[in-house]
């Protein structure tokens, strides 16, 4: 399933840290 050009992968995105009060 690589018949369509995909953007370069930069690895898995880390979860956004929740802002602590």
UniProtKB/Swiss-Prot annotation:
It is found in: Secreted. Changing residue 2 to A: No effect on binding to nAChR from T.californica. It comes from the Eukaryota. Residues 1-21 are annotated as: Disordered. One of its GO terms (cellular component) is extracellular region. Changing residue 13 to A: Severe effect on binding to nAChR from T.californica. Keywords: Acetylcholine receptor inhibiting toxin, Ion channel impairing toxin, Neurotoxin, Postsynaptic neurotoxin, Secreted, Toxin. Residues 3-6, 8-11, 13-14 are annotated as: Implicated in receptor binding. Expressed by the venom gland. Residues 1-14 have a biased composition (Pro residues). GO terms for molecular function: acetylcholine receptor inhibitor activity; ion channel regulator activity; toxin activity. Monomer. In vitro, reversibly blocks human muscle-type nicotinic acetylcholine receptors (nAChR) alpha-1-beta-1-epsilon-delta/CHRNA1-CHRNB1-CHRNE-CHRND (EC(50)=0.44 uM) and alpha-1-beta-1-gamma-delta/CHRNA1-CHRNB1-CHRNG-CHRND (EC(50)=1.56 uM). Binds to nAChR from T.californica (IC(50)=0.03-0.18 uM), human neuronal nAChR alpha-7/CHRNA7 (IC(50)=22 uM) and acetylcholine-binding proteins (AChBP) from L.stagnalis (IC(50)=63 uM) and A.californica (IC(50)=230 uM). Negative results: has no effect on GABA(A) receptors alpha-1-beta-3-gamma-2/GABRA1-GABRB3-GABRG2 and alpha-2-beta-3-gamma-2/GABRA2-GABRB3-GABRG2 or on receptors HTR3A and HTR3A-HTR3B. This is Azemiopsin. It comes from Azemiops feae (Fea's viper).
């Amino acid at each position: 399933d690589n018949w369509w050009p995909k953007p370069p992968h930069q690895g898995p995105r880390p979860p956004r840290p929740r802002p602590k009060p």
